């Protein structure tokens, strides 16, 4: 069996793309100066390639990677429901069936509702306006007061600028998928540091109803984040009869069972 030089073995794995004819450059060839002819250039490339190691291992400092990491993806599931808080399987199945009907209706009548004229006081923010959407959905009063909720003082009329606009079909039908995903992210960020409110619940339900399948990766991550946060807040609710419990259960149910995130589903009570 003939001996095969190491360079030939490498060339079998990395074949030449351009043929290079052998040339005699022994006279006057100086590899330290810029090449003057095509032959000198190709010869210089061959010399530099021969000096490179066959295998290069990058020395990576894990501490630097960890320090510069900007996105944290949690694969953990939802917090288990406290005793007596988890909904029955029948209830979850009923909610999924009703939600499916709502989504079909929204899709069917989207063009109709989109054509309806909005009231003069409805000014929808641009997709990238996070603060604008928070105020639009939750109201300037709630955004200013944090998680304390809107004032219950009676007023002669509803000031939607202060209390937030509800997710009317004439509003959500005007939102494309980019805006829906963005608003879902904005409200999820808000919810991540605050308590659950009816305003949040209504908007989360409407946004999920308008979210198209198959989900984009960003939307997939956001709805899982939403379900996990709902389970965390549910742990802090002092009574199973609290009105927040069925609303939180509903959002967890829709994310896990309608959008097929089964690892987040509640175990039936």
Curated annotation (Swiss-Prot):
Classification via InterPro entries: GEMIN2 (IPR017364), Gemin2/Brr1 (IPR035426)
Q: Cellular component per GO?
A: cytoplasm; cytosol; Gemini of Cajal bodies; nucleolus; nucleus; SMN complex; SMN-Sm protein complex; spliceosomal complex
Residue positions of the PTM Phosphoserine?
A: 70, 155
Q: Where in the cell is it found?
A: Nucleus, Gem; Cytoplasm
**Transferase among keywords:** no
Q: Does the keyword Oxidoreductase apply?
A: no
Q: What is one process in the GO biological process aspect for this record?
A: spliceosomal complex assembly
Which superkingdom? Eukaryota
Identify the Pfam families for this entry: SIP1
Main location class: nucleus
Q: Which UniProt keyword terms apply here?
A: Cytoplasm, mRNA processing, mRNA splicing, Nucleus, Phosphoprotein
Query: Where in the sequence is the signal peptide annotated?
Result: none
Under the subunit heading, UniProt states:
Monomer. Part of the core SMN complex that contains SMN1, GEMIN2/SIP1, DDX20/GEMIN3, GEMIN4, GEMIN5, GEMIN6, GEMIN7, GEMIN8 and STRAP/UNRIP. Part of the SMN-Sm complex that contains SMN1, GEMIN2/SIP1, DDX20/GEMIN3, GEMIN4, GEMIN5, GEMIN6, GEMIN7, GEMIN8, STRAP/UNRIP and the Sm proteins SNRPB, SNRPD1, SNRPD2, SNRPD3, SNRPE, SNRPF and SNRPG. Interacts with GEMIN5; the interaction is direct. Interacts (via C-terminus) with SMN1; the interaction is direct. Interacts with SNRPD1; the interaction is direct. Interacts with SNRPD2; the interaction is direct.
User: Hey, which family's this protein in?
Assistant: Belongs to the gemin-2 family.
PANTHER family xrefs: GEM-ASSOCIATED PROTEIN 2, GEMIN2
Q: What does this protein do?
A: The SMN complex catalyzes the assembly of small nuclear ribonucleoproteins (snRNPs), the building blocks of the spliceosome, and thereby plays an important role in the splicing of cellular pre-mRNAs. Most spliceosomal snRNPs contain a common set of Sm proteins SNRPB, SNRPD1, SNRPD2, SNRPD3, SNRPE, SNRPF and SNRPG that assemble in a heptameric protein ring on the Sm site of the small nuclear RNA to form the core snRNP (Sm core).
In its UniProt entry, what is this protein called? Gem-associated protein 2
Task: Give the organism the record lists.
Answer: Mus musculus (Mouse)
């Amino acid at each position: 069996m003939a001996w095969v030089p190491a360079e030939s073995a490498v060339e079998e794995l990395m074949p030449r793309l351009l043929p290079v004819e052998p040339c005699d450059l022994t006279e006057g060839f100086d590899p330290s100066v810029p090449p003057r002819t095509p032959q000198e250039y190709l010869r210089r490339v061959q010399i530099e390639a021969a000096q490179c190691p066959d295998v290069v291992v990058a020395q990576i400092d894990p501490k630097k990677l960890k320090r510069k990491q900007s996105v944290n993806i949690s694969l953990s599931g939802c917090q288990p429901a406290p005793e007596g808080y988890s909904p029955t399987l029948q209830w979850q199945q009923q909610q999924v069936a009703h939600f499916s009907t709502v989504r079909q209706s929204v899709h069917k009548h989207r063009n109709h509702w989109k054509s309806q004229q909005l009231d003069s006081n409805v000014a929808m923010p641009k997709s990238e306006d996070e603060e604008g959407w928070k105020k639009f959905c939750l109201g300037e009063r709630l955004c200013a007061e944090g998680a304390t909720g809107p004032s219950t003082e009676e007023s002669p009329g509803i000031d939607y600028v202060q209390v937030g606009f509800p997710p009317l079909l004439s509003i959500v039908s005007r939102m494309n998928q980019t805006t829906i995903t963005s608003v879902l992210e904005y409200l999820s960020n808000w919810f991540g540091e605050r308590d659950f409110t009816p305003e949040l619940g209504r908007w989360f339900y409407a946004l999920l109803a308008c979210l198209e399948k198959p989900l984009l990766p960003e939307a997939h991550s956001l709805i899982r984040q939403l379900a996990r946060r709902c389970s965390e807040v549910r742990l802090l609710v002092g009574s199973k009869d609290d009105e927040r419990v069925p609303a939180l259960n509903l959002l967890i149910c829709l994310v896990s069972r309608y959008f097929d995130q089964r690892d987040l589903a509640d175990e039936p009570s």
